[in-house]
């Protein structure tokens, strides 16, 4: 297909406090440089980070305007003269960090994040380096693939790359947002036993239908560390996807098995508080900060998703002209799994 001359996209525009979300029409489409690819975006998805950016509570380098959202999938519609990896029509998803290919992140990894330091995916077309894309499992739709770059990869790196999850392990998943539900699906496929917490009995029932071995309502049992240990027969959990921060970290550690791993992926209750080092040492336990993952992690995750025919859980799909409503729904916290915008 021939490229149109212009497109529509959304921009965050700096205000006195935070940003406003505004649609822009008639925006030129950047022609690809020699090693770049133009992607027609078919779907994007939201993460908690996107709400933080909107509120001005997430560092974006002082930018006055930016295109939001890190997560998106689409098809290649134009390629630069030196591109060898992609062909017109290929289905691709974007990397959250455009320059983190493998191994450890570098000092410049953070400056390559889409929807933050770099313009993101909430546009009809994006132009990205050919190395900043991956293909995705053939059984997934664009809407499903758009959920993978942040939430899927964060769960994968926390449980598998860093956690080395094995069959029979006990896994504690806090809440039923995108990362936790991916964690549930990965654990179930790997033969691990997932324990899911939520304040909603209806969401806990949905988690059981997805394969959760046990569930716990933390509003009814606010001191949940010992009840969680009891659900493991007293062993404790081998993995935690920690999203609560200061509000839950000590409880997660109290529920942890010897040799266990806590993957800190968020801090809904803030990040203050002391790390109980003596308890970590005594249990030979580990705590890791998880900030999405590399391209190599993404490709390994995609192979696992393909092998086990995993389908991401999409709660609601909004149209492109309903992007503001998608933000409102994300901010409400009432979703189960992922929120997607269809382009």
Model-derived segments and spans:
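Glycine-rich phosphate-binding loop and adjacent beta-alpha segment
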Residues: 109-111, 190, 201, 208, ...
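Glycine-rich beta-strand-centered segment in the early N-terminal region that forms part
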Residues: 28-44, 57-101, 117-119, 137-139
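C-terminal capping/lid region of NAD(P)-dependent oxidoreductase domains
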Residues: 2-7, 234, 309-313, 325-343
